[in-house]
Design a protein with these regions (language model features):
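Rossmann-like dinucleotide-binding domain for NAD(H)/NADP(H)
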Residues: 5-7, 11-100
Length: 100
C-alpha cells in the first residue's frame, strides 16, 4: 500500500506516465508532489504543459544523470555491448532492446 499523498519521482521513461492522470492526482491531492527528469514527450511544449509552473512539481531537463562517472560508464558499457554483440554473445549485452 502507498502512503497517503506519496511523492512520485520518475527517472525512467516519460512514456511510462499518464500525464493527464498525474495532473488529476495532483489536483485531487492524491499525490503530494512529482519530480521527473523526463516527460511523456521528449520535446514538450512547456508553455502548455499542465505540470509546469506548479509549486509541487520539479522537472529537470533530461539531464539528471550527467556526471563524469555516468559518462565514463556509458562509454565503457557501449563499447562492451558492441564487442559482445559482434561476438554473438547477446546474453551479455546490457539492455538489448530490439534483437536483429
Amino acid at each position: 500500500l502507498m502512503a497517503r499523498r506519496p511523492i512520485f519521482i520518475n527517472l525512467g521513461r516519460g512514456l511510462c506516465v499518464d500525464e493527464e492522470a498525474l495532473v488529476d492526482a495532483l489536483d485531487a491531492g492524491k499525490l503530494r508532489a512529482f519530480g521527473a527528469d523526463v516527460l511523456y514527450d521528449e520535446t514538450p511544449d512547456l508553455a502548455s504543459n499542465k505540470l509546469v509552473g506548479r509549486d509541487n512539481v520539479i522537472i529537470t531537463p533530461h539531464s539528471a544523470f550527467y556526471s563524469t562517472t555516468a559518462i565514463e560508464d556509458l562509454e565503457r558499457l557501449s563499447c562492451e555491448n558492441i564487442v559482445h554483440f559482434l561476438k554473438g554473445e547477446k546474453e551479455k549485452v546490457f539492455k538489448l532492446v530490439n534483437e536483429v
